[in-house]
Design a protein with these regions (language model features):
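Cytosolic regulatory/linker segments at or just downstream of nucleotide-handling modules
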Residues: 117, 146-182
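Alpha-helix/helix-capping structural signal
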Residues: 7, 116-117, 138, 157
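Catalytic NTP-binding/metal-coordinating core of nucleotidyl cyclase/transferase enzymes
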Residues: 1-76
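Cytosolic nucleotide-binding catalytic cores of signal-transduction proteins
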Residues: 33, 78-81, 85, 140
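Residues that scaffold the ATP/ADP-binding catalytic core of kinase and kinase-like folds
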Residues: 12, 56, 120-121, 161-162
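Catalytic cores and conserved motifs of cyclic dinucleotide signaling enzymes
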Residues: 21, 69, 128-131, 152-153, ...
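Catalytic-core segments of nucleotide cyclases and related cyclic-nucleotide turnover enzymes
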Residues: 67-71, 75, 100-102, 109, ...
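Catalytic core regions of nucleotide second-messenger enzymes
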Residues: 41-49, 82-111, 181
């Protein structure tokens, strides 16, 4: 379960509030890049929420390897989206400079957690949505909320599955996230 969120986007919206087409164009390009990156790693794009993205990895797999391949795919997607996002920002920065003298600083934060979730269509008779639910989803979102711009944070369950395939650095331990699953 993977969440991305743009750090500094609310301030960007405030700075460029008179130029909504610039914001919409940037967001469209970012979301398109995120979707392509997720799909390239066999992920499922769960949803866009404001400037955030939620993706699932392993939904379509049998889980024979206890989520190892899917956890690696999620981390690879995060690693691929980070420079892709930076490229999109650099291109739009040229446009934004024409409309504001303020320095604009935004970055992408990401949180990844591996765990089981209830997956399916949720909603009403007139509108439903394919999504994932449960404590592991909430935990992944909370991890993402802790990520600084440019940072990819993974839970211990994800780290245990990817450590042999992905070089990682220790960012420290976060122990005060409420409702930690398991």
């Amino acid at each position: 379960i993977c969440f991305w969120d743009i750090r500094g986007f609310s301030l960007l919206c405030e700075i460029l509030k008179a130029h909504t087409t610039l914001l919409a164009g940037f967001l469209r390009e970012y979301c398109e890049g995120a979707a392509k990156t997720i799909f390239a790693q066999s992920g499922v794009l769960d949803k866009f929420v404001g400037d955030g993205v939620m993706a699932l990895f392993g939904v379509l797999n049998g889980g024979e390897d206890e989520g190892r391949i899917d956890a690696i795919a999620a981390v690879r997607a995060a690693l691929e989206l980070r420079p892709r996002f930076d490229d999109v920002v650099a291109q739009w920065m040229q446009e934004w400079k024409l409309y504001t003298p303020q320095k604009i600083e935004i970055g992408l934060g990401c949180g990844i957690h591996t765990g089981e979730a209830l997956v399916g269509n949720v909603g009403t008779d007139f509108r439903d949505q394919f999504t994932a639910l449960g404590p592991h989803v909430n935990f992944a979102a909370r991890i993402a909320a802790r990520a600084k711009p440019g940072e990819i944070l993974v839970s211990q369950s994800t780290e245990a599955r990817v450590r042999s395939a992905v070089m990682m650095s220790q960012a420290g331990q976060v122990s005060d996230i409420k409702n930690i699953p398991g």
